[in-house]
Amino acid sequence: MVEGSCHCGKIRIEVEAAPEKVTDCNCSICRRYGTLWAYYPPRQVRIIEDVPTQTYQWGDRSLYFHRCAECGCVTHWSPVDPARDRMGINANLLPPDVLAAAQVHHLDGASYGGFTR
């Protein structure tokens, strides 16, 4: 089990295993958020909320981006469609030693027309 949290600790994330790779996307929203995404099936992720997350949608509105209402850290994204078997956690919330072992995949989301705003 690997655990991470937002800055204030009121949103905690537990995943079954450390990510082997993370995605650094440069689309308009990921670039602004400064996230590294690690992807998991939702059943392998546990989100513990001491305060509710705030959500944001844009573009095709297929994802909810979650952030801590207290400290503002982007914590994860979840699909609008519950049948979609993938979600992303902000790997920057994991311990640095866990993140250091992950391979970084650079995704040119800025060149994909669906990710611009």
Feature roles, as predicted:
Residues M1-S5, K10-R117:
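A short Gly-Trp-Pro
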